[in-house]
Amino acid sequence: MVSVANTQLKIATFNLFNYLEPPNAYYDFERIYSAEQWAKKQKWITEYLREYQPDIIGFQEVFSPESLKELVATQGYHYFAFVDQPEVIDDFIYRSPVVAIASRYPIVDVAAVTANTKLAQTLGLVDDFSFSRKVVRATIEAPHIGNCDCYVVHFKSKRSMIEVDEINNEWSPEKVIIESLKASVAGGWGATIQRGSEAALLMIEMIERREATNNPMLLIGDFNNTLTDGVLNHLLTSTLRFVSTIDRDAYLAKYCLNDAWNLFEVSLTNEGNEGNEENETSRKVIAKRAPTHYFGTSSSVLDYVLLSCEFDASYHDSLYQVSGYDTYDRHLINPIFDRDGESTDHGIVLITLTLRS
């Protein structure tokens, strides 16, 4: 039985960046952690868990799920689930890492989410459309709120789906550039179609599951895209055109998702309106959302936690509100090799949910 004494619930999304136990290699035969590097990576992970104490964690880039299961168990996460295995392309060379979820609270059901292939065909996608990485749905018995469906994703990356074979073609330098450009345009768009389709078809499955169970929903993961550029913004659909307004908003609230950051901003605004000087200071300090990924001189938010209305303080029947939002990025903006040399290339997003009084 889950204790109702707990008034807070912490949720994290954590891209582990090639979590593969040696002597196996990721992608290439030379990419193998030494014993020292592996110990360093595991220590970095456990130190984060020990310091920030998330209750539920969605992991991405997991090549060694059994090893990860053992590691997090040492930190009190006795419930762990995954629904797929990485691909082995040689005796010891791995690719296609999987996602996983760890929880301090009981996982009572686990499933791999599958796309509605008939709907995929209607959208003009291939007949056997599937997620580039299988999506985990774990139903967790959380305090106060009961069974909660937690989805962990790692949507298709922006990497081009078309590779140029320069080696086996005797091309001029100009021809190489032309073919690379064509591959980049077409292959990049192909990746975008896959990523956006994954999000849309997952959302359909989440809505149908919600209709059947009425379980609260959390969507956790590395989206490989910002939520605001149009490719994934249907995950936050909150309006419908040409639909009767009678009961519309109430139904939409039940089936739609909210970005945890936006809910956190609302809670800060509400606290600020109370005139508390300390709250006003915290609003100014946390005025801008921190990026979770850096590439060259650019940065973006790629890692998200989305929540159903039970976690939205503005919803009349909500049980929790988002009281904290932290992006752990010290290893990205001020790395120290001895400490962060085997960390990750993503920031770790952690949200704190507090029971409403």
What are the language-model segments listed below?
Residues 1, 112, 121-124, 128-131, ...:
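Metal-dependent phosphoester-hydrolase catalytic domains
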Residues 1-97, 176-179, 214, 333-347, ...:
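N-terminal, active-site-proximal structural segment of metallo-dependent hydrolase catalytic domains
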Residues 8-21, 147-156, 180-188:
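Active-site-proximal beta-strand elements of phosphoester/diester hydrolases
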Residues 14, 60, 153, 221-222:
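Active-site flanking residues adjacent to catalytic metal/cofactor-binding acidic residues
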Residues 19-24, 159-161, 314-315:
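Short, solvent-exposed loop/turn elements at domain surfaces
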Residues 62-160:
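Structured beta-strand-rich core segments of catalytic domains in phosphoester-bond hydrolases
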Residues 153-183:
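A structural motif
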Residues 185-213:
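A long, amphipathic alpha-helix that forms part
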